[in-house]
Each structure stands twice: as C-alpha cells, then as structure tokens.
C-alpha cells in the first residue's frame, strides 16, 4: 500500500514512521528540508521538499499511485485545499485531513473529506474527564 503524507511536523512524521514500520510505501512532502531529520537517519521512504499544492511535486511524490493521502501541514486552509485537490484532481479515494478548527472540520466532513480534528477530540476528552469527576463526587 502506498501513502503520501503532506506535512512532516510532529504529527506527519509520526504517522509516516508508523506506516513505514507497518510495511507501507511512504512518500513525504514538506516545505522545510530540515523536516527530514524528524524521520531519522535510517528513513527508507521518499522525501520531497516543496509545497503540497504544487501539482508537479504531487505527481513526482506519487499521488497518482497513492492508496491514501494524509495532510497534516500547519494550516487548515492549506490542508483543505490539498485534500480537495487529492480527491478531485487525482481521484485519491482515501484522503485524511487534519483540521484544527472544529467548525471547519464539521463542514468539510460533509464534503467527503475524512477529517481529524484534534481540537474537538481534546474538547470531548476534557469534558468527559470533568463529568467523571462530577459523577465521582455525587
């Protein structure tokens, strides 16, 4: 299976390393060449320097053969646009996008993107933890 990961920060690099360890063919794009260091000296996947909206770079990185695309840059707008490009321009069936803004996350879920919203996950986890305290004190 082949995955293209766009964004190699803390999340993107961890996803890339875990998928590579599980036997996936992993190709990574990041604007910062130094991000390759997050993958370690023994990285055996591909790494491409550039912007995830660059159509030629997406092709070079293998988007046309990708079974999945994971978009984890540091900007919601970029992640949304790149995710939509992967779906509409390249026909990638499994596109997972990190969106930090819960309102945007809900909206783009209805547009066919698989959305991960860590902000919403944190809100739900924290609220559940507080309610558990309430129940323990009753």
Where in the sequence are the language-model features?
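Cytosolic regulatory regions of ion transport systems
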Residues: 1-138
């Amino acid at each position: 299976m082949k995955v293209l990961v766009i964004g190699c920060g803390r999340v993107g690099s961890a996803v890339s390393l875990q998928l590579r360890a599980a036997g996936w063919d992993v190709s990574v794009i990041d604007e910062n060449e130094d991000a390759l260091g997050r993958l370690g000296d023994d990285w055996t996947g591909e790494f491409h320097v550039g912007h995830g909206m660059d159509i030629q770079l997406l092709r070079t990185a293998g988007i046309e053969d990708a079974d999945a695309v994971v978009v984890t840059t540091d900007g919601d707008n970029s992640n949304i646009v790149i995710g939509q490009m992967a779906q509409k321009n390249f026909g990638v069936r499994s596109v997972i996008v990190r969106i930090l803004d819960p309102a945007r996350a809900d909206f783009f879920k209805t547009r066919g993107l698989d959305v991960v919203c860590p902000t919403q996950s944190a809100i739900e986890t924290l609220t559940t933890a507080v309610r558990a305290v309430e129940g323990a004190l009753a």
